[in-house]
């Protein structure tokens, strides 16, 4: 694969392509064009071809893409060819919901450990996942070789917990807190702010209403 930096927008679309390729393979479809992919995943075909071009020649002109080969390629890129364990810090309402979900639709991702400062939760098992005291976080993350963590603690605790995670050797944080975390350059943070997402959705709904009213 060419040694090129992949744009963040492209990286975020890779799981979408991977998921649909799985659907195609399960439907015994062996070949797909960028136009067909475009219609299915709602990404224009030029963008799909540009995304794929970062990884070299993945298809053939006039033929399209071999579904199984492309699926296996992205399986390796996304590390879906092996089990990946992640940790969760903060076993509150959101954390508990994520533990209950635990990526049941994926055979390659699982929450293998959770951490919470509450004594009533420490050293218990929730949804089949062991909950450890925060004091054990560094030890468990290193022993279980965990690279990625889901962060669902209160905002006031988020940076202090993040500092501990960085010390433990974590390389990626899925941040559900409203705080923008300060981390070293080699640590990736993906921010998931449900309030922002809903506000954005409401904005587009209202904007669409205004446009429709103007057309009437």
Curated annotation (Swiss-Prot):
<feature type="DNA-binding region" description="H-T-H motif">
    <location>
        <begin position="16"/>
        <end position="55"/>
    </location>
</feature>
<comment type="subunit">
    <text>Homodimer.</text>
</comment>
<keyword id="KW-0520">NAD</keyword>
<dbReference type="Pfam" id="PF06971">
    <property type="entry name" value="Put_DNA-bind_N"/>
</dbReference>
<dbReference type="Pfam" id="PF02629">
    <property type="entry name" value="CoA_binding"/>
</dbReference>
<keyword id="KW-0805">Transcription regulation</keyword>
<keyword id="KW-0963">Cytoplasm</keyword>
<dbReference type="GO" id="GO:0005737">
    <property type="term" value="C:cytoplasm"/>
</dbReference>
<comment type="function">
    <text>Modulates transcription in response to changes in cellular NADH/NAD(+) redox state.</text>
</comment>
<dbReference type="InterPro" id="IPR003781">
    <property type="entry name" value="CoA-bd"/>
</dbReference>
<dbReference type="InterPro" id="IPR036390">
    <property type="entry name" value="WH_DNA-bd_sf"/>
</dbReference>
<keyword id="KW-0678">Repressor</keyword>
<dbReference type="GO" id="GO:0045892">
    <property type="term" value="P:negative regulation of DNA-templated transcription"/>
</dbReference>
<dbReference type="InterPro" id="IPR036291">
    <property type="entry name" value="NAD(P)-bd_dom_sf"/>
</dbReference>
<dbReference type="InterPro" id="IPR022876">
    <property type="entry name" value="Tscrpt_rep_Rex"/>
</dbReference>
<keyword id="KW-0238">DNA-binding</keyword>
<feature type="binding site">
    <location>
        <begin position="90"/>
        <end position="95"/>
    </location>
    <ligand>
        <name>NAD(+)</name>
    </ligand>
</feature>
<keyword id="KW-0804">Transcription</keyword>
<comment type="similarity">
    <text>Belongs to the transcriptional regulatory Rex family.</text>
</comment>
<dbReference type="GO" id="GO:0003700">
    <property type="term" value="F:DNA-binding transcription factor activity"/>
</dbReference>
<dbReference type="GO" id="GO:0003677">
    <property type="term" value="F:DNA binding"/>
</dbReference>
<protein>
    <recommendedName>
        <fullName>Redox-sensing transcriptional repressor Rex</fullName>
    </recommendedName>
</protein>
<dbReference type="InterPro" id="IPR036388">
    <property type="entry name" value="WH-like_DNA-bd_sf"/>
</dbReference>
<dbReference type="GO" id="GO:0051775">
    <property type="term" value="P:response to redox state"/>
</dbReference>
<dbReference type="InterPro" id="IPR009718">
    <property type="entry name" value="Rex_DNA-bd_C_dom"/>
</dbReference>
């Amino acid at each position: 694969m060419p040694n090129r930096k992949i744009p963040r927008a492209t990286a975020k679309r890779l799981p979408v392509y991977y998921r649909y390729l799985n659907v195609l393979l399960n439907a015994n479809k062996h070949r797909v064009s960028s136009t067909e992919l475009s219609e299915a995943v709602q990404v224009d075909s030029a963008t799909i071809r540009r995304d794929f071009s970062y990884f070299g020649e993945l298809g053939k002109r006039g033929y399209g893409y071999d579904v199984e080969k492309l699926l296996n390629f992205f399986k390796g890129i996304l590390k879906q060819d092996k089990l990946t364990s992640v940790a969760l810090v903060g076993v509150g309402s959101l954390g508990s919901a994520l533990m209950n979900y635990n990526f049941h639709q994926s055979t390659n991702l699982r929450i293998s450990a959770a951490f919470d400062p509450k004594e009533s939760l420490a050293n218990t098992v929730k949804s089949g996942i062991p909950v450890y005291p925060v004091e054990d976080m560094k030890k468990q993350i290193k022993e279980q070789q965990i690279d990625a963590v889901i962060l669902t603690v209160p905002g006031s605790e988020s940076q202090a917990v993040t500092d501990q995670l960085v010390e433990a050797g974590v390389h990626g944080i899925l941040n559900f807190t409203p705080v923008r975390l300060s981390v070293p350059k080699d640590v990736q943070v993906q921010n998931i702010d449900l309030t922002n997402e809903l506000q954005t959705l409401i904005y587009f709904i209202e904007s669409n209403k205004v446009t429709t009213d103007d057309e009437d």
